């Protein structure tokens, strides 16, 4: 008996070396101090971790976020910008990685960098080939 859980072969869970970032979404709140960070990954067999860092126009850290072994390929979280005053342009760096087995160093699968300005509330969407 052959049971198929996935109809679309492109949507089948992938091994860790084939997991990719499909898109990153940012929604800047009206206070210009918070942003919703959203990400969509390809389906995965093993749960990846994600590191997100934001640096300001002066190259200083403006925010960070770590997701350890996510269970879902699509989610969003709110980040807070640390800057007292806006320092455009900001650079968002997202690293998709695996941190186990524990006796090995972190295995980086993909890294994406996007630049954006904090000027007005709204949504930004960055799509990638996966």
Task: Kindly give the residue locations of the regions a language model identified.
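Extended low-complexity, serine/threonine- and proline-enriched intrinsically disordered segments
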Residues: 48-63
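Contiguous beta-strand segments within globular domains
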Residues: 23-45
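Short, surface-exposed loop/turn segments at beta-strand-coil junctions that are enriched for proline
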Residues: 82-88, 99
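Aromatic sugar-binding surface patches on proteins
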Residues: 71-80
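Extracellular Ig-like/FN3 beta-sandwich strand-entry sites
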Residues: 47, 87-93
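Low-complexity, Pro/Ser/Thr- and charge-rich linker/hinge segments at domain boundaries
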Residues: 116-130
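Short, compositionally biased P/S/T/A/G/V-rich stretches that sit at domain boundaries
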Residues: 1-31, 129
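Short acidic/polar inter-strand loop motif in beta-rich domains
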Residues: 96-112
């Amino acid at each position: 008996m052959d049971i198929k859980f996935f109809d679309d072969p492109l949507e089948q869970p992938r091994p860790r070396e084939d997991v990719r970032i499909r898109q990153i979404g940012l929604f800047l709140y009206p206070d210009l101090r918070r942003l919703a960070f959203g990400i969509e990954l390809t389906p995965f067999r093993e749960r990846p971790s994600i590191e997100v860092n934001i640096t300001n126009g002066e190259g200083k850290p403006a925010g960070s976020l770590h997701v350890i072994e996510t269970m879902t390929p699509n989610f969003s979280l709110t980040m807070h910008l640390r800057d007292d005053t806006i320092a455009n342009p900001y650079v968002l760096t997202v690293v998709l990685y695996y941190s186990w087995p524990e006796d090995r160093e972190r295995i980086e699968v993909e890294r994406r960098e996007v630049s954006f300005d904090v000027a007005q509330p709204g949504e930004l969407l960055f799509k990638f080939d996966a």
